[in-house]
Amino acid sequence: EIVASDWSSDVCSSDLLLDNKSILITGGTGSFGKAFTKYVLDNYNPRKIIIYSRDEFKQFIMQNEFKQYADKLRFFIGDVRDKERLTRAFEGVDYVIHAAALKQVPACEYNPAEAIKTNIHGAQNVIDATLDTGVKKVVALSTDKAVNPVNLYGGTKLVSDKLFIAANAYAGSKDICFSIVRYGNVAGSRGSVIPFFHNIIKNGGTELPITDYRMTRFWISLQQGVELVIKALEESKGGETFISKIPSFKITDLAQAMLPGCEMPEVGIREGEKLHEIMVTVEDSMNTYEYDKHFIVYPQMVWSESRRAVPTGKRVAEGFSYSSGNNTEWLSVEQIRELLKTIDLEK
């Protein structure tokens, strides 16, 4: 039997990395922010966790969900577009997790200037606020869509990634480190295929539309996303991109796991959508090293000898790439069915 934990990262909390530390999460009321907050509060003893986000109502809901941790949690209303507010919020913070983004692909296509303000200018504001305060480490969340981007959202995240990697050059003598964590759609996250299918089934639908029968995706749980961020906080020296090793699945197999024997009309690929999620390109592979449960793409720039990240993993073969289409590990229909039980689709 396959369970989600079989693909869990080997996070080592023995060095109590987050104990007595102050951590701020931009976009902290989202699904990642909530899961990260819960994981840290359950496994460490942080000084405080600051949730920095725009929506007062979502903060109110999260405050109620985390009532028992009230003494450890702070809620700041603020936008990553507002550098002054960010700088004030970063005072006294040790680690920043940058999760705030406009991430719905169609919304970004339709409102490109807004996506640029949040995803690109917001990233630069986080960097500037970090350099102006005492923050030690920043981990920015990226996406497979930033790799060979075909839509505006992916384009903005590519620029954001480049900004965070280059930001290490501006740290100078300060002990500051910026790194990136890249993963695909979290299984069951808002706006992804699992809730979409679930809704059709719930409303009595008997067929599940597939954009392209060849389409594949990675399966990553929220827990694995959180653990990869902890891994980056533990190990990053500056400029690395951390990528989880996770299994792939075919969208047709997902449909059969959710509604066995259903009709699957092929409706055509949507604008800005890829057949396969790409995590590491052939070009990236020159600087990519493999570890037990993840890959790291190391930066091409070296800022100073003391800040150089020395790879201890195995260099990947020439011509290597990592996508949901060429993965070595695949989920069967039965395995998908088991993993679906771990997702709360009624939330």
Predicted regions and their residues:
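Single conserved hydrophobic/aromatic residue that forms the stacking wall/gate
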Residues: E1-C12
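Conserved Rossmann-fold NAD(P)-dependent oxidoreductase catalytic core, especially the SDR/UDP-sugar
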Residues: Y95-H98, L102-L158, K162, A166
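Conserved residues in the N-terminal Rossmann fold of short-chain dehydrogenase/reductase
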Residues: S53, F76-I77, K117, E266
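Conserved Rossmann-fold cofactor-binding substructure of NAD(P)-dependent oxidoreductases
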Residues: R74-Y95
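C-terminal substrate-binding subdomain of Rossmann-fold SDR/epimerase-dehydratase oxidoreductases
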Residues: P209-K347
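NAD(P)-dependent short-chain dehydrogenase/reductase
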Residues: L152-Y153, L158-S236, P247-G261
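N-terminal Rossmann NAD(P)H-binding glycine-rich loop of SDR-like oxidoreductase domains
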Residues: K21-L41
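Conserved glycine-rich Rossmann-like NAD(P)H-binding loop of the short-chain dehydrogenase/reductase
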Residues: N45-K58
